[in-house]
């Protein structure tokens, strides 16, 4: 539960298209305001991490070609990208550099293959060596050797090579590793807030599964939970609630690069 929720006006009691401009009678004044998660406290970050864990685990059920990836920046590339931002410094600059680099990486990929590469990346500040910002995550592609050529900003880790065979895998353990950065306590970079850069529709395959039928709107009998592989019932991610047309008192949409995810 959010530690610092904000209270916003309940749109139900304002003139809108849904009510035809006729505000319904207020039976309880407490319903005039609705609590909305702050999105920044520890509890909100934990909830965000759990939702991404579920969505990513669901996604790899349907997309089998995901690889664990680490994208870095050389000093030269970092400072060259930094020159494109004026009046931005510190951690904000680090995140802006990552956004720009990923956007250009995707543009180069689309130019060569006529299609974007499915991705989920999260930023982190380094602690050794250059201490430059870098990214961990998953890229869904069979063209592993092309990643470093098209990235162009620094070293790319795509797995260890043993006896000429590249070892790389994406499973539940991998997902737990990358999503931990959402809530990771960095004692050196205490004020740093990581950014998630992602393709739209991560985990959307769940909507096509028969299991999702149990989440369709059925009034008071509507099921708003998701069953994990271990059999645990957890809260259904907001993304699926919206996709399944489940009606709740409040909804949150995550937006990355202007795209609903």
Task: Outline where the language-model segments fall.
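Right-hand nucleic-acid polymerase module
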Residues: 1-131, 141-261
């Amino acid at each position: 539960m959010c530690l610092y929720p904000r209270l916003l006006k309940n749109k139900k009691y304002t003139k809108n298209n849904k009510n035809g401009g006729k505000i319904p009678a207020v039976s309880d004044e407490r319903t005039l305001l609705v609590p909305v998660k702050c999105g920044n406290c520890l509890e909100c970050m934990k909830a965000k991490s759990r939702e991404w864990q579920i969505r990513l685990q669901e996604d790899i059920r349907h997309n089998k070609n995901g690889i664990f990836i680490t994208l870095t920046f050389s000093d030269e590339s970092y400072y060259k990208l930094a020159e494109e931002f004026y009046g931005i410094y510190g951690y904000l600059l680090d995140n802006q550099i990552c956004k720009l680099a990923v956007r250009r990486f995707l543009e180069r990929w689309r130019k060569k293959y006529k299609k974007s590469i499915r991705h989920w990346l999260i930023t982190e500040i380094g602690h050794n060596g250059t201490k430059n910002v870098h990214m961990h995550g998953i890229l869904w592609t069979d063209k592993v050797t092309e990643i470093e050529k098209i990235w162009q900003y620094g070293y790319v880790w795509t797995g260890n090579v043993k006896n000429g065979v590249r070892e790389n895998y994406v499973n539940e353990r991998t997902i737990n590793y990358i999503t931990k950065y959402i809530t990771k306590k960095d004692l050196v970079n205490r004020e740093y807030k990581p950014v998630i850069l992602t393709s739209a529709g991560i985990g959307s395959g769940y909507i096509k599964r028969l299991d999702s039928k149990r989440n369709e709107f059925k009034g008071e009998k509507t099921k708003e939970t998701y069953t994990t592989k271990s059999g645990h019932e957890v809260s259904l991610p907001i993304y699926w609630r919206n996709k399944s047309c489940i009606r709740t008192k409040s909804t949150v949409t995550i937006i990355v690069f202007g795209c609903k995810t």
